[in-house]
Regions:
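Short, basic/glycine-rich phosphate-binding loops at helix/coil junctions
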Residues: 2, 92-105
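Acidic, low-complexity terminal tails and accessory targeting/binding regions
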Residues: 74-84, 127-132, 148-198
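Short basic (Lys/Arg) and small-residue
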Residues: 139
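Phosphate-coordination/substrate-recognition cap region in phosphate-metabolizing enzymes
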Residues: 21-93
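Alpha-helix capping/helix-boundary segments
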Residues: 41, 142-143
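Short coil/turn segments at beta-strand junctions that form active-site/ligand-binding loops
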Residues: 30-32, 130-134
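Active-site catalytic microenvironments for nucleophilic, acid-base chemistry
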Residues: 25, 48-52, 124, 128, ...
Length: 198
């Protein structure tokens, strides 16, 4: 598995299939806005989701691109397989594995700076879309920070929750606080696989 970070790569066939299954699952949900990272893999997911089932909201009828929802910049690790990063940069990989707050992958983004970026954009979205239902398309690292924001799990703590690709997560913002209503829901993907079984 490669460290993608902010490398701007398109979805593969599996990713496109997953995006269509997300769209199927969201039939009947009315969104007031669709906000996406501007990285191609998130934007393609947004486009496939809204075009497939017509969930594009009124009045704008557009996806709002938000660069602040980009994945973390993994600097010198980007494009490498995890095993390659560990072999080429053993001390740096240890800092990564230990979730060192200020480790920035050379020219990348530290965990503390990344978390501050995610907190800022989520606060802005909550304020801008108060009382509305918003479809947000982003990346695993961003979701890691969002989950920790909502649950109080410290940034340095090992991850004890899943972040599967194309899962649906439902969060709510009320009284200046995020809460998780449903996390890592993959029923739409499992159901689709069952349909393919002999």
């Amino acid at each position: 598995m490669r460290v993608q970070g902010q490398l701007d790569i398109p979805l593969n066939a599996t990713g496109r299939w997953q995006a269509k299954k997300v769209a199927d699952e969201l039939i009947g949900v009315e969104f007031d806005a669709v906000v996406s990272s501007d990285l191609l893999r998130a934007l393609e997911t947004a486009q496939l989701s809204i075009v497939r089932k017509g969930v594009l909201p009124a009045p704008t009828g557009q996806i709002q691109l938000q660069p602040e929802l980009r994945e973390r910049h993994y600097g010198m690790f980007q494009g490498l397989k995890y095993v390659e990063a560990q072999q080429q940069f053993p001390e740096d990989f240890a800092a990564h594995a230990n979730r060192h707050l200020e480790f920035a992958y050379g020219n990348g983004e530290s965990l503390s700076n990344f978390a501050a970026r995610v907190n800022k954009v989520m606060s802005a979205l909550a304020e801008q879309h108060a009382g509305n239902t918003v479809l947000v398309l982003t990346h695993g690292g961003v979701l890691d920070v969002i989950y920790r924001m909502a649950t109080g799990l410290p940034l340095q703590a090992p991850r004890n929750f899943p972040i599967p690709n194309a899962a649906i997560n439902w969060l709510e913002h009320a009284n200046a606080q995020w809460s998780v209503n449903d996390w890592a829901n993959c029923v739409h993907l499992e159901r689709a696989l069952d349909e393919l079984a002999p």
